[in-house]
């Protein structure tokens, strides 16, 4: 039995890492238990044949307070997407302002914007008005690694099986602490904490293709009004380090299950090019891309489920990096107020 920490955090996603950073800064000992081999949760990438491949379309918005306060974006060579009044272009007929923005928001929420709470839509609108999202060198994993780097006690490749009172039981050991924070995906969270409801998750698939035949202007985000692909961009035009060979690397997103040949046909239509010779690089089907946030759901759900047991993540906030990080911060602040009441 290990019991030398004040708080156990299950999951090293952005919410759990944020909570751990706050707690460690307050002098509260914390152990983070992560089932995978790296930090960041969904904020991760792979490197294949010199290409940086984010899992999903991963961009960082410098207007998000927690991202901004981390101070990491400038250190990681943050580069914004194309600037200007219209940083994206619409593929398809535009008759009304709704035709202009709803396809873009569909790519943000990975769902029909009409299914998303108006409160959440306003939060996202404000974030885009305040800052231009972009990429960092090394891909999404570079941010996650840097964000986790100051933390002193993270256990990777360790799966949590259950929580019994103040004890966390894993496939390696048992840990005991006065307080526990569950910072996992919502499906795992409901398996560990029966008191919370299941959250519906939106799925998506990200496709990567490369070409040596340059497509001019492809660094400007293409948003598709009607079609199986909802967006596409030459991600290496935004961040050259995403392709060490110099070939253009295209990232495209779909919400439906389609074949790779269908993706090529859509890419040909979007970019007005013969894509038959484009190299297929990778495909990432992400079944838990973002939590749905329907009308009536509060912007933030309570993070303390019962005394000493907290659940955090963007499914307890709103679907964004800021929502995840803020939920982790809320849990940490409540714990800090309990442990150090004079600091509240």
Q: Locations of the language-model features?
A:
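N-terminal Rossmann-like FAD-binding beta1-loop-alpha1 element of flavoenzymes
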Residues: 5-32, 336
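Conserved Rossmann-like nucleotide-cofactor binding loop
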Residues: 15, 38, 187
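Glycine-rich FAD pyrophosphate-binding loop
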Residues: 24-48
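Dinucleotide-binding Rossmann-like beta1-alpha1 core, especially the glycine-rich loop
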Residues: 48-107
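Active-site/ligand-binding neighborhood in enzyme catalytic cores
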Residues: 84-166, 174-177, 183
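Mid-domain catalytic core of redox enzymes
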Residues: 162, 167-270
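Conserved flavin/dinucleotide-binding core of flavoenzymes
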Residues: 240-344
């Amino acid at each position: 039995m290990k019991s030398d920490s004040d708080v156990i955090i299950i999951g090293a996603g952005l919410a759990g890492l944020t909570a751990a950073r706050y707690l460690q800064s307050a002098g509260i000992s914390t152990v983070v238990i992560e089932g995978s081999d790296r930090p960041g949760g969904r904020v991760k990438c792979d490197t294949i044949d010199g290409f940086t491949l984010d899992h999903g379309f991963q961009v960082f918005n410098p207007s998000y307070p927690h991202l901004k306060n981390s101070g990491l974006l400038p250190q990681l060579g943050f580069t914004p997407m194309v600037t200007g009044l219209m940083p994206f272009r619409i593929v398809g007929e535009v008759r009304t302002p709704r035709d202009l923005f709803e396809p873009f928001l569909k790519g943000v929420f990975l769902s029909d914007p009409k299914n998303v709470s108006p409160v959440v839509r306003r939060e996202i609108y404000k974030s885009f008005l305040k800052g231009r999202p972009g990429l960092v060198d090394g891909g999404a994993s570079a941010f996650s690694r840097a964000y986790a780097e100051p933390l002193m006690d993270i256990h990777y490749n360790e799966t949590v099986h259950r929580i019994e009172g103040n004890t966390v039981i894993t496939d390696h050991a048992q840990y005991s602490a006065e307080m526990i924070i569950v910072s996992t995906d919502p499906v795992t969270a409901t398996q560990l904490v029966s008191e919370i409801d299941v959250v519906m998750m939106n799925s998506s698939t990200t496709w990567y293709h490369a070409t040596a035949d340059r497509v001019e202007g492809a660094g400007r985000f293409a948003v598709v009004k009607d079609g199986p692909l909802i967006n596409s961009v030459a991600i290496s035009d935004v961040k050259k380090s995403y392709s060490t060979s110099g070939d253009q690397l295209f990232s495209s997103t779909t919400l439906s299950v389609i074949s790779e040949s269908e993706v090529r046909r859509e890419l040909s239509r979007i970019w007005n090019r013969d894509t038959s010779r484009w190299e297929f690089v990778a495909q990432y089907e992400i079944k838990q891309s973002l939590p749905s946030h329907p009308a009536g759901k509060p912007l933030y759900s309570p993070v303390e489920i019962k005394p000493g047991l907290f659940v955090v993540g963007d499914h307890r906030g709103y679907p964004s990096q800021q929502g995840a990080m803020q939920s982790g911060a809320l849990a940490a602040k409540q714990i800090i107020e309990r442990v150090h009441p004079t600091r509240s």
